[in-house]
């Protein structure tokens, strides 16, 4: 069974993904993030068709502690955050957390 990408965030953040063909998205206006972002993320987490959730790194600050812990420890779907200066190190940590090994580990021999 193939799984889909879901994007959660502001209209500005989700629009590009929608134009690229992502069909699952939860749009939350910036002014409503504190009230609505938790529910949008829970919806994506609970969707069996979703394998990856994409969010802007800065949006993690708007999540309640419980939802943030749920999404950060979720194996499937896996959270990928973009922006906010996370860089390659942030992606490396996300991959390591998701699959349990460091694919980018340098061989010390």
UniProtKB/Swiss-Prot annotation:
<keyword id="KW-0406">Ion transport</keyword>
<keyword id="KW-0066">ATP synthesis</keyword>
<comment type="similarity">
    <text>Belongs to the V-ATPase F subunit family.</text>
</comment>
<dbReference type="GO" id="GO:0046933">
    <property type="term" value="F:proton-transporting ATP synthase activity, rotational mechanism"/>
</dbReference>
<dbReference type="GO" id="GO:0042777">
    <property type="term" value="P:proton motive force-driven plasma membrane ATP synthesis"/>
</dbReference>
<dbReference type="Pfam" id="PF01990">
    <property type="entry name" value="ATP-synt_F"/>
</dbReference>
<dbReference type="GO" id="GO:0046961">
    <property type="term" value="F:proton-transporting ATPase activity, rotational mechanism"/>
</dbReference>
<comment type="function">
    <text>Component of the A-type ATP synthase that produces ATP from ADP in the presence of a proton gradient across the membrane.</text>
</comment>
<dbReference type="InterPro" id="IPR036906">
    <property type="entry name" value="ATPase_V1_fsu_sf"/>
</dbReference>
<protein>
    <recommendedName>
        <fullName>A-type ATP synthase subunit F</fullName>
    </recommendedName>
</protein>
<dbReference type="InterPro" id="IPR022944">
    <property type="entry name" value="ATPase_V1-cplx_fsu_bac/arc"/>
</dbReference>
<keyword id="KW-0813">Transport</keyword>
<dbReference type="InterPro" id="IPR008218">
    <property type="entry name" value="ATPase_V1-cplx_f_g_su"/>
</dbReference>
<comment type="subunit">
    <text>Has multiple subunits with at least A(3), B(3), C, D, E, F, H, I and proteolipid K(x).</text>
</comment>
<dbReference type="GO" id="GO:0005524">
    <property type="term" value="F:ATP binding"/>
</dbReference>
<keyword id="KW-1003">Cell membrane</keyword>
<dbReference type="GO" id="GO:0005886">
    <property type="term" value="C:plasma membrane"/>
</dbReference>
<keyword id="KW-0472">Membrane</keyword>
<keyword id="KW-0375">Hydrogen ion transport</keyword>
């Amino acid at each position: 069974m193939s799984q889909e990408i879901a994007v959660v965030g502001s209209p500005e953040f989700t629009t590009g993904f929608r134009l690229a063909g992502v069909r699952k998205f939860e749009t939350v206006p910036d002014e409503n993030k504190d009230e609505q972002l938790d529910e949008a993320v829970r919806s994506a987490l609970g969707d069996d068709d979703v394998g990856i959730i994409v969010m802007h790194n800065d949006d993690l600050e708007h999540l309640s502690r419980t939802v943030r812990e749920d999404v950060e420890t979720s194996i499937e779907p896996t959270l990928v955050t973009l922006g906010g200066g996370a860089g390659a190190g942030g992606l490396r940590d996300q991959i390591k957390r998701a699959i349990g090994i460091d694919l980018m580990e340098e061989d010390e021999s």
